């Protein structure tokens, strides 16, 4: 009988890209090299060269960074599986932070790798276009709890974008609103408030411009029901049906990432 190891997976979101990403994997594992080659072939340009050599500015373009992060995440997962030999990794549940949610769908068999790459490339382009139409910014608030950050947002007009932990919350929205929120949070005693180096107000209502385009491409892709519970960013709760997953992806464009709740759900489930 084949031995199994029960695992749960979490995958990173945008902002984790860095020039040189994936190069060690490609140099040392044929499987990783094949995965990166498939990305190049699918997208029609040398994404792998951009990942390995940059420049930074081009890799930071959201339509490039999103498929790059997905490609490296998928390569890490598949190389790990291969390295386990006769020990099969059986996923109990999977979560991903924002973009990482799409990687969860690939490794869970909900969508194909090639469709996933095309989907996140288009998602990145749509998010960029939305940022041009409705510019905004984001900031990380460290040292205030969720209720306190809600007060900051109600007083400034900013929106909560990522609840990452009890005292690390990212806000998003119109740049003037976020700037005001930064000042209010500092006055309320936040340990640190950091304006993030991003090109738009992601996970806020300013991304609504991208919704129609994302809905269209979601309808063009084949989705399967998932055998593995996918922890939804917008609720921190599991979804499995194809329809639920597509609805979650569309909702996630403008809604807050409930990362703290996602991790807590996994812990409560015995992961």
Predicted regions and their residues:
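FabD-like malonyl-/acyl-CoA
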Residues: 2-148, 192, 196
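Alpha/beta catalytic cores of group-transfer enzymes, especially the acyltransferase/condensing modules
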Residues: 14-16, 108-256
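A short, well-structured juxtamembrane/interface segment
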Residues: 258-265
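Conserved functional loop/turn residues at catalytic and ligand-binding sites
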Residues: 98, 222, 270
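Short loop/turn motifs at secondary-structure junctions
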Residues: 90, 189, 270-271
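Non-catalytic positions within long, well-ordered alpha-helices that form the structural scaffold/packing
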Residues: 186, 267-268
């Amino acid at each position: 009988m084949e031995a199994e190891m029960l695992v749960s997976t979490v995958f990173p979101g945008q902002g984790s890209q860095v020039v040189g990403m994936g190069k060690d994997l490609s140099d040392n594992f044929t499987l990783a090299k094949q995965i990166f080659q498939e990305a190049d072939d699918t997208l029609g340009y040398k994404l792998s060269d951009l990942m390995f050599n940059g420049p930074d500015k081009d890799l930071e373009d959201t339509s490039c960074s999103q498929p790059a992060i997905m490609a490296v995440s998928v390569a890490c997962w598949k190389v790990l599986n291969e390295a386990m030999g006769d020990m099969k990794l059986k996923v109990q549940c999977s979560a991903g932070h924002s973009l990482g949610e799409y990687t969860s769908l690939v490794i869970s068999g909900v969508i194909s790798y090639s469709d996933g790459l095309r989907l996140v490339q288009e998602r990145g382009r749509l998010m960029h276009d939305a940022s041009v139409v409705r510019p905004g910014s984001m900031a990380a608030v460290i040292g205030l709890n969720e209720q306190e950050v809600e007060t900051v947002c109600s007083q400034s007009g900013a929106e909560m974008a990522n609840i990452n932990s009890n005292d690390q919350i990212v806000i998003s929205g119109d740049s003037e609103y976020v700037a005001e929120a930064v000042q209010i949070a500092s006055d309320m005693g936040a340990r640190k408030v950091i304006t993030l180096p991003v090109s738009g107000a992601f996970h806020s209502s300013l991304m609504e411009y991208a919704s129609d385009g994302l809905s269209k491409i979601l309808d063009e892709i084949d989705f399967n029901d998932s055998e593995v519970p996918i922890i939804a960013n917008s609720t921190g709760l599991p979804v499995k049906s194809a329809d639920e997953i597509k609805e979650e992806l569309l909702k996630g464009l403008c809604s807050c990432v409930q990362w703290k709740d996602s991790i807590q759900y996994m812990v409560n489930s015995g992961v």
